[in-house]
Regions:
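Gram-negative (and chloroplast) outer-membrane scaffold detector with strong preference
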Residues: 58-132, 162, 191-193
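Extracytoplasmic loops and strand-loop junctions of Gram-negative outer membrane beta-barrel proteins
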Residues: 38-41, 79-81, 133-138, 169-172
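Outer-membrane beta-barrel "beta-signal"
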Residues: 32, 95, 181-193
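Surface-exposed extracellular loop regions of Gram-negative outer-membrane beta-barrel proteins
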Residues: 148-168
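Cleavable N-terminal export/targeting peptides
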Residues: 1-29
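Short glycine/proline- and aromatic-enriched beta-strand/turn motifs that initiate or cap beta-hairpins
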Residues: 22-72, 190-192
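Membrane-embedded beta-strands of outer-membrane beta-barrel proteins
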Residues: 55-57, 94-98, 150-152, 156, ...
Length: 193
C-alpha cells in the first residue's frame, strides 16, 4: 500500500512538471532577446540571390496585453547588378518600434503581430568608390538614411521561453539614392528572459 502511494505521488509530480506552464509567458516588463536572419525582396531578383542577406539582434520588452516594444540593430547587404559587375549596397540600421497582437490561438502558443517602427542608420554604396570597373562614374553616394517601417510577424512558442519567428517588413527609407521602399523577409529565434 505504501509503495503504491509513493508511486502514485511520483507519477502525479512527474505529470505536473511535464505539462506546459503558461504562467511565465508574455508578462508585463518581461524582456527578451532575438536573433534574426533576413533576405531582401528585390524586384526581378531571385529570393535567395548570392550576397543578398541581413542579420539582426533585437531587445524586446513586453507591455500589457501581449504587446511589446523593441530596439533592433540590423545589418543588410544587397548586390545590385550592373552589367557583369555587382554594386554592393550595405545598410546598418537601428529600429525603435512597437508590436501589437492581432490574432492568437486559444492556448496562446501562436501569435500574429502587426507593428510600426522608426529607423535610422548609414547606407554605403560600392564601398564609397565612385568609379566602376568599366570606368563609369557612380552618381549614387553613401549617406545617412532615416525613415519608418511596417512589420508583421508570426511568433510560435516552442517552449515557455523560446519562440520561433517569421517576419515581414516594409521599410521606407528617406535620404537614400537607391530603392526608397524595401521589403524584407526574416526568420529567427527569441529567448524571453
Amino acid at each position: 500500500m505504501k509503495n503504491k502511494l509513493i508511486l502514485s505521488t511520483c507519477v502525479v509530480v512527474a505529470m505536473a512538471f511535464s505539462l506546459p506552464s503558461h504562467a511565465q509567458r508574455l508578462i508585463p516588463k518581461q524582456r527578451g532577446m532575438e536573433v534574426v536572419g533576413s533576405v531582401p525582396l528585390i524586384k526581378g531578383e531571385k529570393l535567395f540571390a548570392k550576397d543578398n542577406f541581413g542579420v539582426g539582434v533585437s531587445l524586446i520588452r513586453y507591455l500589457k496585453r501581449e504587446n511589446y516594444v523593441f530596439v533592433l540593430a540590423e545589418y543588410e547587404q544587397q548586390n545590385m547588378p550592373y552589367r557583369d559587375y555587382g554594386v554592393k549596397l550595405k545598410d546598418a540600421l537601428l529600429h525603435l518600434g512597437y508590436m501589437h497582437p492581432i490574432l492568437s490561438d486559444n492556448g496562446k502558443n501562436v501569435f500574429l503581430y502587426g507593428g510600426i517602427s522608426a529607423l535610422g542608420g548609414y547606407e554605403e554604396i560600392n564601398e564609397d568608390k565612385k568609379l566602376l570597373p568599366d570606368r563609369a562614374t557612380l552618381l549614387d553616394r553613401s549617406r545617412f538614411v532615416y525613415g519608418g517601417a511596417v512589420h508583421g510577424s508570426v511568433e510560435v512558442f516552442l517552449t515557455d521561453r523560446l519562440l520561433f519567428l517569421v517576419k515581414a517588413q516594409g521599410r521606407l527609407l528617406f535620404g537614400s539614392d537607391v530603392h526608397r521602399f524595401r521589403p524584407v523577409l526574416s526568420a529567427g529565434l527569441r529567448f524571453n528572459l
